[in-house]
């Protein structure tokens, strides 16, 4: 359960809460996200809206740290500063340690490494002024076609996910940041995307209790400070068994947030909405009503609030009686309590990790990656017999987004080059380009970069994958190695491939580990933390 406040922390909460006007209390419930706004914009906005949390971005980490320090100086009440760091602070480009993605963590299955990773992420986050992390993802990836969870999930075993997630979140919170478990009541069942519609956790409630419910109870008992509901329904609990698609998302459901999460599961911490711009939420009400209805449903902090309008809309909602003042102040109390637990009233930015810590964090990431590599298919010898000077072709198939840190697999090529191999690289080649390049090399490494939400709405191989020509390459070249630098489920779509490993993401440490496995320097010892789909003969329900 939540760690009790110290005497000093409790006194700060009571004093601060007692001095809050209604407008200030409402402001604490807003998280403003403006990634391209100037410093002057933020300072002007702060004079107009007393927001409680801020998400921003800068051209460099040093600029970001300086900006956050200035913002905290101007804030009457310390700000929560959230970030997604699902696989490390390296998600902020050019900074911090890059860990494997969550499914790789599940494949490594090492609680001690999870705890060290939690320490690393927290230390690197606080050093730049981030104090609230939107991780861990504790969704169970039961549906291999789910386009959101995939390698962001630790797996599909509730007991293992509970064990790894609690080690992770407790370590982060012990080192000065608030962890957020997401996405209540649980993603990973539907094959659709809440960016595009409200998705459904269609499990009967007794089965939900034995699976998702077990994980949620575990993180609550472990003391998680924050929970993020998704734009996801749980119709069997909500009373929509006959018409499940009509059930509202958790972000608009007092039945889920109050009756289930708070009363049945006993959660007393902060509840933050998922992104308020997603269609899974916006389809349910007019824009002017969404913030009011979300807060009225039990949300404490409204994520990605409209900075120009939602503050006034919430105040008007109180005046109209749609939200009670008691509820506003109750949510404001929970916001202040989380700030107090983080001691933000004393220090908003932590010390930089020492040189020894930086080495430890990097070694931890590599150890986790080395333990995560999983053999998906080994009908041929995994080790590539290559000598210095051999010519190799590396091929990346995937959708890149450099501004989000999703770049080509350059570390993989560098590692091969450091071992004396002559590397030629192709990105999303056509079949003809691939065949021609493969004719003059000793080996080909085909690297499949398929990660969640790239593109939205599907976890399947699309777009560039359609023209990759893997069939002709497979039959024409005798020495081909396939690596899933993302979804391991690509194995389902590559039945003829006889040599395939999973690295579960493109983190630098995972690229290094994959090279070591292919060249015989490391044994792949990861265990697939999800069930692989199978082709079966079965009748249709017609």
Language-model segment annotations:
Residues 35-48, 113-121, 125, 208-218, ...:
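Short, acidic/polar
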Residues 47-60:
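A short aromatic-anchored loop/beta-hairpin motif
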Residues 79-87, 134, 331, 479-486:
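Short beta-strand elements of ligand-binding domains
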């Amino acid at each position: 359960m939540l760690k009790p406040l110290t005497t000093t922390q409790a006194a700060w909460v009571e004093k601060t809460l007692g001095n809050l006007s209604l407008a200030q209390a409402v402001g604490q419930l807003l998280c403003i996200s403006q990634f391209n706004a100037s410093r002057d914009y933020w300072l002007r906005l702060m004079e107009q809206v007393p927001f409680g949390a801020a998400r921003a971005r800068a051209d460099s980490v040093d600029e970001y740290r300086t900006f956050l320090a200035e913002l905290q100086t101007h804030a009457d009440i310390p700000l929560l500063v959230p970030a997604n760091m699902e696989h490390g602070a390296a998600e902020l480009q050019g900074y911090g340690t890059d860990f494997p993605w969550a499914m790789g963590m599940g494949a490594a299955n090492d609680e001690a490494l999870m705890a060290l990773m939690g320490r690393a992420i927290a230390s690197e986050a606080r050093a730049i002024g981030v104090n609230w992390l939107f991780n861990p993802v504790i969704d169970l990836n039961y549906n291999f076609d789910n386009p959101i969870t995939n390698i962001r999930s630790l797996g599909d075993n509730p007991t293992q996910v509970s064990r790894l997630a609690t080690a992770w979140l407790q370590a982060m919170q012990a080192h000065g940041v608030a962890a957020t478990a997401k996405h209540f009541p649980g993603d990973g069942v539907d094959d659709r995307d809440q960016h595009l519609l409200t998705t459904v956790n269609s499990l009967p409630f007794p089965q939900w209790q034995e699976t998702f419910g077990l994980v949620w109870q575990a993180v609550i008992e472990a003391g998680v400070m924050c929970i993020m509901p998704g734009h996801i329904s749980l119709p069997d609990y909500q009373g929509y068994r006959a018409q499940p698609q009509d059930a509202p998302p958790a972000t608009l459901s007092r039945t889920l947030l109050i009756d289930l999460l708070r009363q049945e599961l006993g959660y007393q911490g902060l509840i933050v909405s998922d992104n308020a711009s997603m269609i899974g939420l916006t389809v349910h009400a007019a824009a002017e009503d969404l913030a009011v209805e979300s807060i009225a449903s039990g949300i404490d902090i409204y994520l990605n609030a409209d900075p120009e309008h939602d503050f006034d809309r919430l105040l008007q909602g109180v005046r109209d009686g749609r939200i009670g003042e008691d509820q506003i102040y109750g949510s404001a109390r929970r916001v202040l309590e989380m700030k107090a637990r983080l001691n933000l009233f004393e220090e908003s930015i932590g010390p930089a990790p020492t040189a020894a810590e930086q080495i430890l964090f990097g070694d931890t990431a590599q150890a986790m990656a080395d333990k995560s590599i999983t053999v998906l298919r080994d009908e041929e010898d995994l080790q590539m017999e290559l000598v210095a000077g051999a010519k190799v072709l590396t091929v990346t198939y995937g959708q890149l987004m450099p501004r989000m840190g999703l770049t080509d697999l350059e570390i993989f090529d560098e590692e091969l080059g450091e071992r004396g191999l002559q590397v030629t690289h192709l990105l999303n080649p056509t079949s003809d380009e691939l065949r021609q390049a493969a004719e003059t090399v000793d080996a080909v490494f085909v690297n499949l970069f398929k990660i969640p939400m790239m593109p939205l709405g599907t976890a399947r191989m699309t777009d560039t994958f359609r023209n990759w020509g893997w069939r002709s390459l497979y039959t024409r070249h005798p020495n081909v190695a396939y690596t899933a630098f993302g979804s391991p489920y690509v194995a389902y779509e590559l039945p003829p491939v006889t040599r395939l490993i999973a690295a579960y993401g493109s983190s630098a440490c995972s690229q290094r580990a994959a090279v070591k496995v292919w060249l015989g320097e490391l044994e792949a010892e990861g265990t697939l933390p999800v069930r692989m789909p199978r082709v079966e003969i079965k009748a249709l329900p017609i």
